Amino acid sequence: QTRKIILRKRYWLYYALTFIAGARRQIFIVFAGFLMVEKFGYSVTQITALFLLNAAFNIWFAPIVGKLITRVGERAALVFEYLGLIGVFVSYAVVESGMIAAGLYVLDHMFFAFAIAIKTYLQKIGDPADMASTASVAFTINHIAAVFVPVLFGGLWLISSSAVFFAGAAM
């Protein structure tokens, strides 16, 4: 394992997918939660119930996704994830029902299980000596998204909550 931080051109797609995953996580954690509370008046108890439902459901769902990724490959799994997220984000932008929004929230969280495909993609394309340093770079890229997306999209939220989700779908 290389102990130096190395940014390699051949891993550009992995880095891009990592940034998108970090941005998407922030949209889910911050702005989907805002939507549930601000637009639909969800209480702390209701949001907590959704968190618990998501956690319980993913205990069952994540192993299925892992087997699916093994069967169809990372590319197909990630295409499915991102197409699904486009649908979820566009739906967040236009939803008028709190119950449908809650369903979208659970569906949105289900797609987190597909994030493992990004890691297995790196394992397939990466040099074993680069794994630690590439993971360090990816961790940093993910955190860059975690810092900038809430700030930028928070400003956008002040203009239009729907615009946040349309921008997330475009990303």
What is each residue range found by the language model?
Residues 113-126:
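Intracellular juxtamembrane helix-capping segments at the cytosolic ends
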